[in-house]
Amino acid sequence: MLSKIIGSVVGTKNERELKRMHKVVSKINAYEATIQALSDEQLQQKTEEFKARHQNGESLDALLPEAFAVCREASLRVNGMRHYDVQLIGGITLHEGKIAEMKTGEGKTLMGTLAMYLNAISGKGVHLVTVNDYLAARDAELNRPLFGFLGMNVGVIYSQQPPQEKVAAYQADITYGTNNEYGFDYLRDNMVFSLREKKQRPLNFCIIDEIDSILIDEARTPLIISGQAEDSSRMYALINTIIPVLIRSKDEEANKNNEEEDFWIDEKNRQIEISEKGYEKIERFLIEVGELGENESLYSPSRLPLLAHVQAAIRAHHVFVKNIHYIVDDGEVVIVDENTGRTMPGRRWSEGLHQAVEAKENVEIQAENQTLATTTFQNFFRLYDKLSGMTGTADTEAAEFKSTYDLDVIVIPTHEPIARIDMDDQIFLTKLGKYKGIIREIQEIQAKGAPVLVGTATIEASEELSYLLDQEGVKHNVLNAKQHEREAEIIAQAGSPKSVTIATNMAGRGTDIILGGNWQSFIEDIDSVSPEEMQRLKAQWQIKHDQVVAAGGLHIIGSERHESRRIDNQLRGRAGRQGDPGMSRFFLSLEDDLMRIFAGDRVVNMMRAMGLKEDEAIEHKMVSKSIENAQGKVESRDFDARKNLLKYDDVANDQRKVIYGQRDDLLAEMDLLQAIKIMHQEVYNAMINQFIPPGSIDDQWNVDGLEDELENEFKIAMPINDWLDEDRRLDEEGLRAKLIQTALDRYDNRREQMGEKEAAQLERHFMLQSLDKHWKEHLTQMDQLRKGIHLRGYAQKNPEQEYKRESFELFQMMLGAIKSETVQDLSRVHIPTKEELAALEVQQRENAAHMQMQFEHSDIDNMDGGVERAAVQGRNVVAGAAGAGVAGAMAGNGNNDNEPNPYAGMNISRNAPCPCGSALKYKQCHGKI
């Protein structure tokens, strides 16, 4: 209440910001006459002038008014488009590191050129991020003439791009690309073996198009580079056979304590729970087929992977639905993005879910992957010195943008007042009744001559509605994940008179629907068009445009409410662009998922008590309020999940920064000798402590054990007993110093035999190899820790604090293992020739080159015990060769029988891949020690 009173007096924060920016716009406009008077050559020279002024200390803020005026004039001369004042405000917003909410059709692409031009003056690079390769290439080509005129070069990055071309794209003043590609390049850059192989420059300024889609909808999307793990396809196929005989509870809430059912599903959170009866049935089946011993349980430490297979299979059969969450295309399970309706070829759900769905659909079951490097969009984009974004719908998520990314949202006024009319929702008892209501509405709109866009939430809904329209003889086009290749053609004419287009959620499609249709699409297939023919086509289009305007513009029909208000607003925003007329209305039924799961019983009972017929609808404020409350609950739940993820990922992110920083230091450091000597001292000290405890007397010493360990681990024969016999005064401190100095002297001799340059090369090789290997193992351990950490809550412990504590301990152990292995390898390796060293580098690069792009879709919400909601969020994976490296070939025996097992106590399945990266099963490697 107080904030409303204050706002009415001094204006809202958004109003105050707009008022401040209007003053800057006045300064920009004041330059217009002067800039217009310049010749093309003089206008182009302004860029070099700005660069010189900036290098001499003038800030970009100070340059902004004149630079924006120059960019606006250049745009008018090159493209015939002049930035409106509201677009100038948007450009200021982006430059200041904020989010500009600008409605559909208001010119976000043109607006972005202002901030991109200004920030490119610094020479540090500007990244424009889009949601797909098509938009990146389209926008780059669209703006290349403008930036070229101003002396700026433009680059585009894409998957599978030749290395030199990608480097050139990143060196450009302005670079376009997708969020996935920027993120993967960051991870790949931290797996190179030379600084020359890095592609990216330091991350300077970033503008994210459709920022809500990338930083909210995909916030829980880990970017992962992975290698292939053990093939478990037989197990997935086996578990798949038991799922049909498990009994699901019909009334999830009422039967949670009913032991007659085998499992139940919490649809609100998409979680599953198996009853005691269900566990017994599953265990009996696994015992019968020989996968479980008579006295074993699914909760036995070595059998937990089996339990994960079962849970994934139940979710595959009962949570993930064909033609809603995925389609089967050419023998492959392809995920459908619930927010956009697009298929995502190559993406895969993680943690066994995708394999379980493949088993369910009886297609080839592909192998799982092991993580080699990972980050999230949340943490990647926070690496930029300055981050900004633009979208048509951000204000509903303003609180999350501020708390997570420290980004303010500025709502930019429209150039023309919005003429679209948003009608009240119509609510029906049944889905069929709702579809009948939609068809009546379509027929009425068609009779007026207006175009209709029907938005559906799923492929299944679009096909059901299409079938009913066919039955009624209504011509229409369908745009969903199965017709994406016709997308441009369908959208181009979706604004034509009487056209009917059914589309799954249109978020992020990046194409405006023009009233009357897109006349330019008519001439794309014609080789040459005369000026007269061009004028005739334009005149025909103008007639159609005027007809549609007279009929009320584009009419939007939503076939159900989305869980997020933002997606609903994106659908509404397809109509009413740049002051055009339009209308929107949502049709709902009590059978819709949102209504069925979240709407209160009061609403359902009230509608049924009214005695409505199937095709009768009501419009009631209480129902609308109930829907808004339901959407608010879902948005709040998703926000909490993203916030929860960030708490855990921030721990991994801090460790990632340390490892990547050390890796860069290794690549940049010419002389590693001092670091190697310190490493030797630490490793030998730690080993000596095991056999000669600090402050101990000689009766407590295990000298024979120390001699054996030095021989086994480092191939060093030290006559410690002889030293003690020769010098009775040699105490613990003196002996320690002599041992370490002897080891260092021995290493100095080996370096002399190798040669300074060759020794430095070998040191860098072994340190990099050990760091990469143990970081990969550490990521696997962190993933295992995260999956089970929620169980600490049952012991009255804080899972988050426990995760931080244990992950730190794992990190310290990893650093110790890196040092120990590096010293071991350097001590045991035979002195290589120059040819062998060259072969090492070649093999390293070949291993890196084997990586292939693959995506995996997952939710990582299991910190709190939840199951995957992977239809909503995603997980991206790059699959690659995950070999154990080349050190083993040079270092002689890898594991000997006297080595302690570093993975003891970790409850690793004996048939699982050994965490050391040897590619052997655990029972054949460290597990047999």
Curated annotation (Swiss-Prot):
Q: Which Pfam families match?
A: P-loop_SecA (PF21090), SEC-C (PF02810), SecA_DEAD (PF07517), SecA_PP_bind (PF01043), SecA_SW (PF07516)
- Which Gene Ontology MF annotations are present? ATP binding; metal ion binding; protein-exporting ATPase activity
Q: Name one GO biological process term.
A: protein transport by the Sec complex
Against InterPro entries, the record matches this protein to: Helicase_ATP-bd, Helicase_C-like, P-loop_NTPase, SEC_C_motif, SecA, SecA_CS, SecA_DEAD, SecA_motor_DEAD
**Protein's cellular compartments:** Cell inner membrane; Cytoplasm
Q: How is the cofactor bound?
A: May bind 1 zinc ion per subunit.
Q: Which family does it belong to?
A: Belongs to the SecA family.
* Protein's name in the database: Protein translocase subunit SecA
Species of origin: Psychrobacter arcticus (strain DSM 17307 / VKM B-2377 / 273-4)
The organism's taxonomy opens as: Bacteria, Pseudomonadati, Pseudomonadota, Gammaproteobacteria, Moraxellales
